[in-house]
């Protein structure tokens, strides 16, 4: 690494430490020429797959767009930003884990719905109504009935739903 003070090409590492929950390495360096010290941070560059839209266009994965979708669906719902960020991180991890260079936007939409189903059932129905383009009340009823059946079959989901109702409102 070049010294930021004298531009010499030779520096030595004095100290290395893991930071940011082990996702970065902090290195203290010293220039061999001018003896100045400086700090660098090293992190893995994780490339997200490109998104293939329904019309066939391709665009880079946009984490902000993903987060905005969650925020819109969860507006005025009792879900913390930490839970939203964790859901975004889980989706990014699963998308990278596919190993694909490109993914259909439908895959991302289904991942969002899966996370919302666990976070907040009202937000799930809200998102699904837009994502799946519900046309009438029957489609809402069908989705809510499916959620009710799934919740009855899965005690964990029922417990999460009942805990959300215990949150005090203003």
From Swiss-Prot:
A zinc finger (unnamed) spans 3-34. Its cofactor is Zn(2+). GO terms for molecular function: ATP binding; DNA binding; zinc ion binding. It comes from the Bacteria. Keywords: ATP-binding, DNA-binding, Metal-binding, Nucleotide-binding, Repressor, Transcription, Transcription regulation, Zinc, Zinc-finger. Residues 161-170 have a biased composition (Basic and acidic residues). InterPro entries: ATP-cone_dom (IPR005144), NrdR-like_N (IPR055173), RNR_NrdR-like (IPR003796). Residues 49-139 form the ATP-cone domain. Pfam families: ATP-cone, Zn_ribbon_NrdR. GO terms for biological process: negative regulation of DNA-templated transcription. Residues 150-170 are annotated as: Disordered. Binds 1 zinc ion. NCBIfam families: transcriptional regulator NrdR. Negatively regulates transcription of bacterial ribonucleotide reductase nrd genes and operons by binding to NrdR-boxes. Belongs to the NrdR family. HAMAP family: NrdR. This is Transcriptional repressor NrdR. The lineage of its organism: Bacteria, Pseudomonadati, Pseudomonadota, Gammaproteobacteria, Oceanospirillales.
């Amino acid at each position: 690494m070049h010294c930021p003070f004298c531009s010499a090409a030779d520096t030595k590492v004095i100290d290395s430490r893991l930071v940011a929950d082990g996702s970065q390495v902090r290195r203290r360096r010293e220039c061999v020429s001018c003896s100045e010290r400086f700090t660098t941070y090293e992190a893995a560059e994780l490339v997200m797959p490109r998104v293939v839209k329904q019309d066939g266009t391709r665009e880079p994965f946009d984490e902000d767009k993903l987060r905005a979708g969650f925020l819109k669906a969860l507006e005025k719902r009792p879900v913390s930003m930490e839970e939203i960020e964790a859901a975004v991180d889980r989706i990014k991890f699963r998308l990278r884990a596919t190993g694909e260079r490109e993914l259909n936007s439908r895959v991302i939409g289904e991942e969002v719905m899966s996370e919302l189903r666990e976070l907040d059932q009202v937000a799930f129905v809200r998102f699904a109504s837009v994502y799946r383009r519900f046309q009438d009340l029957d489609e809402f009823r069908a989705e809510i009935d499916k959620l009710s059946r799934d919740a009855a079959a899965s005690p964990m989901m029922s417990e999460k739903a009942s805990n959300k109702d215990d949150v005090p409102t203003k």
